[in-house]
Protein backbone atom coordinates (compact mmCIF):
# COMPACT_ATOMS: atom_id res chain seq x y z
CA UNK A 1 0.00 0.00 0.00
CA UNK A 2 1.06 3.59 -0.63
CA UNK A 3 0.84 6.59 1.73
CA UNK A 4 0.48 10.20 0.61
CA UNK A 5 0.36 13.34 2.77
CA UNK A 6 -1.32 16.23 0.96
CA UNK A 7 -1.16 20.00 1.20
CA UNK A 8 -3.64 21.54 3.67
CA UNK A 9 -5.83 22.68 0.77
CA UNK A 10 -6.13 19.04 -0.45
CA UNK A 11 -4.01 19.79 -3.50
CA UNK A 12 -0.77 18.09 -4.54
CA UNK A 13 1.01 15.55 -2.30
CA UNK A 14 3.90 16.77 -0.17
CA UNK A 15 7.34 15.64 -1.30
CA UNK A 16 9.46 14.05 1.44
CA UNK A 17 12.43 12.33 -0.21
CA UNK A 18 14.30 11.86 3.07
CA UNK A 19 11.56 9.69 4.59
CA UNK A 20 10.35 6.17 3.90
CA UNK A 21 6.76 5.39 4.89
CA UNK A 22 5.20 1.99 5.62
CA UNK A 23 1.47 1.48 6.09
CA UNK A 24 0.92 -0.73 9.13
CA UNK A 25 -2.86 -0.94 9.46
CA UNK A 26 -6.12 0.82 8.72
CA UNK A 27 -9.65 0.53 10.08
CA UNK A 28 -13.18 1.55 9.17
CA UNK A 29 -16.37 1.68 11.21
CA UNK A 30 -20.08 2.26 10.81
CA UNK A 31 -21.19 4.96 11.12
CA UNK A 32 -18.35 7.13 9.89
CA UNK A 33 -16.34 5.17 7.33
CA UNK A 34 -12.55 5.63 7.64
CA UNK A 35 -11.66 5.48 11.33
CA UNK A 36 -7.91 5.13 11.99
CA UNK A 37 -4.72 4.32 10.13
CA UNK A 38 -1.17 3.79 11.37
CA UNK A 39 1.90 4.55 9.29
CA UNK A 40 5.55 4.37 10.31
CA UNK A 41 8.33 6.57 8.95
CA UNK A 42 12.12 6.27 8.95
CA UNK A 43 14.71 8.74 7.75
CA UNK A 44 16.81 11.69 8.85
CA UNK A 45 16.18 13.27 12.25
CA UNK A 46 15.50 16.64 10.65
CA UNK A 47 12.86 15.21 8.31
CA UNK A 48 11.21 13.28 11.14
CA UNK A 49 10.83 16.43 13.26
CA UNK A 50 9.55 18.42 10.29
CA UNK A 51 6.55 16.08 10.11
CA UNK A 52 5.17 18.05 13.07
CA UNK A 53 4.65 21.00 10.71
CA UNK A 54 2.04 18.99 8.83
CA UNK A 55 -0.37 18.09 11.63
CA UNK A 56 -3.96 17.71 10.39
CA UNK A 57 -2.85 17.62 6.76
CA UNK A 58 -4.96 15.32 4.55
CA UNK A 59 -3.84 11.71 4.17
CA UNK A 60 -4.58 9.22 1.41
CA UNK A 61 -3.79 5.51 1.39
CA UNK A 62 -3.81 3.64 -1.91
CA UNK A 63 -4.21 -0.07 -2.55
CA UNK A 64 -1.90 -2.14 -4.73
CA UNK A 65 -3.87 -1.06 -7.80
CA UNK A 66 -3.28 2.61 -6.88
CA UNK A 67 -6.95 3.17 -6.05
CA UNK A 68 -7.91 5.14 -2.90
CA UNK A 69 -8.45 2.73 0.01
CA UNK A 70 -8.56 5.08 3.03
CA UNK A 71 -8.68 8.86 3.62
CA UNK A 72 -8.36 11.15 6.62
CA UNK A 73 -5.82 13.45 8.26
CA UNK A 74 -2.69 13.33 10.44
CA UNK A 75 -4.03 13.31 14.01
CA UNK A 76 -1.15 12.14 16.23
CA UNK A 77 2.60 12.05 15.63
CA UNK A 78 5.11 10.21 17.81
CA UNK A 79 8.81 10.76 17.09
CA UNK A 80 11.57 8.56 18.53
CA UNK A 81 15.11 9.94 18.35
CA UNK A 82 17.69 8.29 20.57
CA UNK A 83 16.30 8.10 24.10
CA UNK A 84 13.69 10.81 23.49
CA UNK A 85 10.08 10.32 22.45
CA UNK A 86 7.99 13.34 21.45
CA UNK A 87 4.26 13.19 20.81
CA UNK A 88 2.09 15.81 19.11
CA UNK A 89 -1.71 15.39 19.21
CA UNK A 90 -4.54 17.27 17.56
CA UNK A 91 -7.27 15.99 19.88
CA UNK A 92 -6.32 18.56 22.54
CA UNK A 93 -6.44 21.56 20.19
CA UNK A 94 -9.19 24.07 20.99
CA UNK A 95 -8.93 27.44 19.27
CA UNK A 96 -12.44 28.78 19.92
CA UNK A 97 -13.64 28.72 23.53
CA UNK A 98 -16.63 29.77 25.61
CA UNK A 99 -17.69 29.03 29.19
CA UNK A 100 -21.14 28.13 30.49
CA UNK A 101 -21.57 29.17 34.12
CA UNK A 102 -24.17 29.71 36.81
CA UNK A 103 -23.84 33.34 37.81
CA UNK A 104 -23.18 34.28 41.43
CA UNK A 105 -23.25 38.01 42.11
CA UNK A 106 -20.50 39.38 44.38
CA UNK A 107 -21.75 39.45 47.98
CA UNK A 108 -24.46 36.87 47.26
CA UNK A 109 -24.67 33.25 48.45
CA UNK A 110 -27.30 32.15 45.93
CA UNK A 111 -26.53 30.65 42.54
CA UNK A 112 -28.17 32.54 39.73
CA UNK A 113 -29.30 31.59 36.27
CA UNK A 114 -27.24 29.91 33.57
CA UNK A 115 -25.13 32.24 31.45
CA UNK A 116 -22.60 31.82 28.66
CA UNK A 117 -19.60 33.99 27.91
CA UNK A 118 -18.94 35.31 24.45
CA UNK A 119 -16.87 33.02 22.25
CA UNK A 120 -13.23 33.99 21.69
CA UNK A 121 -10.87 32.46 19.18
CA UNK A 122 -7.28 32.53 18.03
CA UNK A 123 -7.42 33.60 14.39
CA UNK A 124 -3.98 32.24 13.49
CA UNK A 125 -4.82 28.78 14.79
CA UNK A 126 -8.22 28.81 13.08
CA UNK A 127 -6.57 29.77 9.79
CA UNK A 128 -4.19 26.83 10.15
CA UNK A 129 -6.41 24.08 11.57
CA UNK A 130 -9.99 25.23 11.14
CA UNK A 131 -12.34 25.74 14.07
CA UNK A 132 -11.96 23.46 17.11
CA UNK A 133 -14.53 24.51 19.72
CA UNK A 134 -14.53 23.93 23.46
CA UNK A 135 -17.50 24.78 25.70
CA UNK A 136 -16.35 24.67 29.33
CA UNK A 137 -18.66 24.57 32.35
CA UNK A 138 -18.20 26.31 35.72
CA UNK A 139 -20.69 26.40 38.58
CA UNK A 140 -21.12 29.37 40.90
CA UNK A 141 -18.93 31.91 39.07
CA UNK A 142 -18.93 35.59 38.29
CA UNK A 143 -18.78 36.81 34.71
CA UNK A 144 -15.17 37.94 35.19
CA UNK A 145 -14.18 34.54 36.58
CA UNK A 146 -15.80 32.70 33.67
CA UNK A 147 -14.08 34.96 31.14
CA UNK A 148 -10.72 34.43 32.83
CA UNK A 149 -11.19 30.64 32.64
CA UNK A 150 -12.14 30.97 28.99
CA UNK A 151 -9.07 33.04 28.12
CA UNK A 152 -6.75 30.70 30.02
CA UNK A 153 -8.10 27.67 28.18
CA UNK A 154 -7.66 29.36 24.80
CA UNK A 155 -4.07 30.31 25.59
CA UNK A 156 -3.31 26.75 26.71
CA UNK A 157 -4.95 24.76 23.92
CA UNK A 158 -4.88 26.95 20.79
CA UNK A 159 -1.97 24.97 19.31
CA UNK A 160 -0.99 21.28 19.49
CA UNK A 161 0.87 20.52 22.72
CA UNK A 162 4.04 18.43 22.56
CA UNK A 163 4.72 15.88 25.29
CA UNK A 164 8.19 14.49 25.95
CA UNK A 165 9.18 11.10 27.37
CA UNK A 166 12.60 9.64 28.08
CA UNK A 167 13.02 6.11 26.80
CA UNK A 168 16.26 4.60 28.11
CA UNK A 169 15.85 1.69 25.70
CA UNK A 170 17.18 3.88 22.87
CA UNK A 171 14.59 2.82 20.32
CA UNK A 172 15.39 3.06 16.63
CA UNK A 173 14.93 6.53 15.17
CA UNK A 174 11.58 6.84 13.48
CA UNK A 175 8.06 8.18 13.70
CA UNK A 176 4.57 6.75 14.03
CA UNK A 177 1.76 8.62 12.32
CA UNK A 178 -1.75 7.92 13.61
CA UNK A 179 -4.39 9.24 11.25
CA UNK A 180 -8.13 9.70 11.81
CA UNK A 181 -10.99 9.78 9.34
CA UNK A 182 -12.84 13.00 8.53
CA UNK A 183 -15.90 11.78 10.46
CA UNK A 184 -14.03 12.87 13.59
CA UNK A 185 -13.96 16.47 12.32
CA UNK A 186 -17.71 16.67 12.96
CA UNK A 187 -16.95 16.52 16.70
CA UNK A 188 -14.89 19.74 16.57
CA UNK A 189 -17.84 22.16 16.50
CA UNK A 190 -21.13 22.47 18.38
CA UNK A 191 -24.42 22.68 16.52
CA UNK A 192 -27.37 24.84 17.51
CA UNK A 193 -30.72 25.37 15.79
CA UNK A 194 -33.34 27.80 17.07
CA UNK A 195 -36.10 26.60 14.74
CA UNK A 196 -38.81 24.32 16.10
CA UNK A 197 -40.27 22.89 12.90
CA UNK A 198 -40.65 19.16 12.31
CA UNK A 199 -38.03 18.26 9.70
CA UNK A 200 -37.11 14.93 8.08
CA UNK A 201 -34.04 13.54 9.89
CA UNK A 202 -31.81 13.02 6.86
CA UNK A 203 -32.54 16.61 5.79
CA UNK A 204 -31.51 17.72 9.29
CA UNK A 205 -28.24 15.83 8.87
CA UNK A 206 -27.60 17.64 5.59
CA UNK A 207 -28.24 20.99 7.31
CA UNK A 208 -25.77 20.13 10.09
CA UNK A 209 -23.07 19.29 7.54
CA UNK A 210 -23.64 22.62 5.77
CA UNK A 211 -23.35 24.50 9.07
CA UNK A 212 -20.47 22.67 10.77
CA UNK A 213 -18.82 20.32 8.27
CA UNK A 214 -15.98 22.64 7.32
CA UNK A 215 -13.81 19.81 5.98
CA UNK A 216 -16.62 18.03 4.14
CA UNK A 217 -17.79 18.85 0.63
CA UNK A 218 -21.47 18.07 1.15
CA UNK A 219 -24.02 15.34 1.80
CA UNK A 220 -25.03 12.49 -0.51
CA UNK A 221 -28.45 11.25 0.60
CA UNK A 222 -29.15 8.01 -1.25
CA UNK A 223 -32.12 7.07 0.96
CA UNK A 224 -34.22 9.56 2.92
CA UNK A 225 -35.20 8.39 6.39
CA UNK A 226 -38.91 9.12 6.03
CA UNK A 227 -38.99 10.12 9.72
CA UNK A 228 -39.41 13.68 11.00
CA UNK A 229 -38.50 15.25 14.34
CA UNK A 230 -38.02 18.68 15.87
CA UNK A 231 -35.06 20.51 14.41
CA UNK A 232 -34.36 22.45 17.63
CA UNK A 233 -30.89 22.04 19.16
CA UNK A 234 -29.68 23.98 22.20
CA UNK A 235 -26.11 24.24 20.89
CA UNK A 236 -24.22 22.41 23.63
CA UNK A 237 -23.65 19.15 21.73
CA UNK A 238 -21.23 18.50 18.88
CA UNK A 239 -22.40 18.24 15.30
CA UNK A 240 -21.33 14.59 15.31
CA UNK A 241 -23.43 13.87 18.42
CA UNK A 242 -26.48 15.47 16.80
CA UNK A 243 -25.99 13.41 13.63
CA UNK A 244 -25.64 10.20 15.65
CA UNK A 245 -28.94 10.95 17.41
CA UNK A 246 -30.67 11.45 14.07
CA UNK A 247 -29.17 8.27 12.61
CA UNK A 248 -30.33 6.29 15.65
CA UNK A 249 -34.01 6.66 14.73
CA UNK A 250 -33.39 4.73 11.52
CA UNK A 251 -35.84 4.77 8.64
CA UNK A 252 -39.61 4.50 8.29
CA UNK A 253 -39.13 0.92 7.07
CA UNK A 254 -37.60 -0.07 10.41
CA UNK A 255 -34.02 -0.37 9.20
CA UNK A 256 -30.78 1.32 10.21
CA UNK A 257 -29.72 4.58 8.61
CA UNK A 258 -26.04 4.33 7.69
CA UNK A 259 -23.44 7.04 7.18
CA UNK A 260 -19.87 7.27 5.93
CA UNK A 261 -17.45 9.89 4.65
CA UNK A 262 -16.67 8.82 1.09
CA UNK A 263 -13.47 9.51 -0.84
CA UNK A 264 -14.87 12.85 -2.06
CA UNK A 265 -15.47 13.87 1.57
CA UNK A 266 -19.23 13.73 1.17
CA UNK A 267 -21.29 12.38 4.06
CA UNK A 268 -23.08 9.55 2.32
CA UNK A 269 -26.42 8.50 3.89
CA UNK A 270 -28.18 5.26 2.96
CA UNK A 271 -30.49 2.60 4.34
CA UNK A 272 -29.18 -0.72 5.61
CA UNK A 273 -30.08 -3.47 3.12
CA UNK A 274 -32.41 -6.30 4.16
CA UNK A 275 -30.85 -9.30 5.88
CA UNK A 276 -30.46 -11.57 2.88
CA UNK A 277 -27.70 -13.52 1.22
CA UNK A 278 -28.74 -11.80 -2.00
CA UNK A 279 -27.49 -8.52 -0.48
CA UNK A 280 -24.08 -9.89 0.55
CA UNK A 281 -21.17 -7.86 -0.82
CA UNK A 282 -18.25 -9.81 0.64
CA UNK A 283 -17.66 -13.56 0.73
CA UNK A 284 -15.31 -15.41 3.04
CA UNK A 285 -14.08 -18.85 2.08
CA UNK A 286 -13.06 -21.62 4.46
CA UNK A 287 -9.39 -20.91 3.69
CA UNK A 288 -9.84 -17.31 4.86
CA UNK A 289 -9.81 -15.75 1.40
CA UNK A 290 -11.94 -12.62 1.02
CA UNK A 291 -13.85 -12.19 -2.22
CA UNK A 292 -16.16 -9.49 -3.48
CA UNK A 293 -18.96 -9.33 -6.01
CA UNK A 294 -16.56 -8.00 -8.62
CA UNK A 295 -13.75 -10.30 -7.51
CA UNK A 296 -11.38 -7.44 -6.63
CA UNK A 297 -8.19 -9.06 -5.35
CA UNK A 298 -7.29 -6.11 -3.10
CA UNK A 299 -10.69 -5.86 -1.40
CA UNK A 300 -9.17 -6.64 2.02
CA UNK A 301 -7.03 -3.49 1.75
CA UNK A 302 -10.24 -1.44 1.83
CA UNK A 303 -11.44 -3.10 5.08
CA UNK A 304 -15.09 -3.11 3.96
CA UNK A 305 -17.74 -2.23 6.57
CA UNK A 306 -21.45 -1.45 6.44
CA UNK A 307 -22.00 -4.54 4.29
CA UNK A 308 -23.53 -7.98 4.58
CA UNK A 309 -20.98 -10.78 4.45
CA UNK A 310 -21.48 -14.44 3.66
CA UNK A 311 -19.44 -17.48 4.60
CA UNK A 312 -18.85 -19.43 1.42
CA UNK A 313 -18.43 -23.22 1.46
CA UNK A 314 -18.25 -23.18 5.28
CA UNK A 315 -21.70 -23.91 6.78
CA UNK A 316 -22.96 -27.44 5.90
CA UNK A 317 -26.25 -27.55 4.01
CA UNK A 318 -27.63 -30.01 6.59
CA UNK A 319 -27.79 -27.28 9.28
CA UNK A 320 -31.41 -26.35 10.07
CA UNK A 321 -31.49 -22.54 9.80
CA UNK A 322 -35.14 -22.48 10.88
CA UNK A 323 -33.93 -22.92 14.46
CA UNK A 324 -31.15 -20.30 14.46
CA UNK A 325 -30.38 -17.21 12.42
CA UNK A 326 -28.32 -18.09 9.39
CA UNK A 327 -24.79 -18.33 10.87
CA UNK A 328 -23.24 -17.86 7.48
CA UNK A 329 -24.67 -14.36 7.03
CA UNK A 330 -23.29 -11.46 9.07
CA UNK A 331 -23.28 -7.66 9.16
CA UNK A 332 -19.88 -5.96 9.38
CA UNK A 333 -19.90 -2.99 11.79
CA UNK A 334 -16.14 -2.45 12.06
CA UNK A 335 -13.08 -3.85 10.33
CA UNK A 336 -9.30 -3.59 10.38
CA UNK A 337 -6.77 -4.43 7.70
CA UNK A 338 -3.24 -5.36 8.78
CA UNK A 339 -1.08 -4.19 5.90
CA UNK A 340 1.95 -6.11 7.17
CA UNK A 341 0.30 -9.54 7.29
CA UNK A 342 -2.43 -8.91 4.71
CA UNK A 343 -5.14 -9.92 7.19
CA UNK A 344 -8.69 -8.50 7.22
CA UNK A 345 -10.38 -8.61 10.63
CA UNK A 346 -14.13 -7.84 10.63
CA UNK A 347 -16.14 -7.12 13.77
CA UNK A 348 -19.74 -8.04 13.16
CA UNK A 349 -23.00 -6.75 14.65
CA UNK A 350 -23.40 -8.04 18.19
CA UNK A 351 -19.90 -6.86 19.20
CA UNK A 352 -18.21 -10.22 18.73
CA UNK A 353 -15.12 -10.67 16.65
CA UNK A 354 -15.19 -13.09 13.76
CA UNK A 355 -13.31 -16.16 14.92
CA UNK A 356 -10.69 -16.41 12.20
CA UNK A 357 -8.55 -13.87 10.49
CA UNK A 358 -9.49 -13.12 6.92
CA UNK A 359 -6.58 -13.12 4.55
CA UNK A 360 -6.25 -10.96 1.49
CA UNK A 361 -7.28 -12.97 -1.52
What label would you give each PLM region?
Residues 1, 11, 16-27, 81-128, ...:
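Acidic, low-complexity/disordered segments
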Residues 2-3, 60, 65-93, 172-187, ...:
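Short beta-strand-centered interaction patches in the first periplasmic/extracellular domains
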Residues 2-8, 44-80, 169-174, 197-211, ...:
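Short, acidic/charged, Gly/Pro-enriched secondary-structure junctions
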Residues 3-5, 37-41, 59-61, 74, ...:
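Hydrophobic beta-strand residues in large extracellular and virion-surface proteins
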Residues 8-34, 126-166, 274-291:
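Short beta-strand/loop turn elements enriched in aromatics
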Residues 16-59, 63-67, 152-153, 170, ...:
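Extracellular/virion structural assembly segments
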Residues 17, 30-39, 99, 172, ...:
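Amphipathic, non-transmembrane alpha-helical segments in extracytoplasmic/periplasmic proteins
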Residues 88-151, 155-157, 197-230, 239, ...:
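Intrinsically disordered, low-complexity terminal/linker regions enriched in Pro/Ser/Gly
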Amino acid sequence: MQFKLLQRDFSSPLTMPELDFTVQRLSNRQPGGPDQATITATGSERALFELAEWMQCPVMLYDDHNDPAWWGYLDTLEINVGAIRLAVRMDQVFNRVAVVYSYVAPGSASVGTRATTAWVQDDDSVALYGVHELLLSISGATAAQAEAARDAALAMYKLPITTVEVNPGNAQNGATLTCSGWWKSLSWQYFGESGTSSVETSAQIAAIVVAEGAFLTGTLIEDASGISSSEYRQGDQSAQFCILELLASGTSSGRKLLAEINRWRELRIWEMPDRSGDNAEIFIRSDGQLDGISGVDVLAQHAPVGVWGLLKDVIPSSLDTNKIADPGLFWVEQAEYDAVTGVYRPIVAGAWRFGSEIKEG
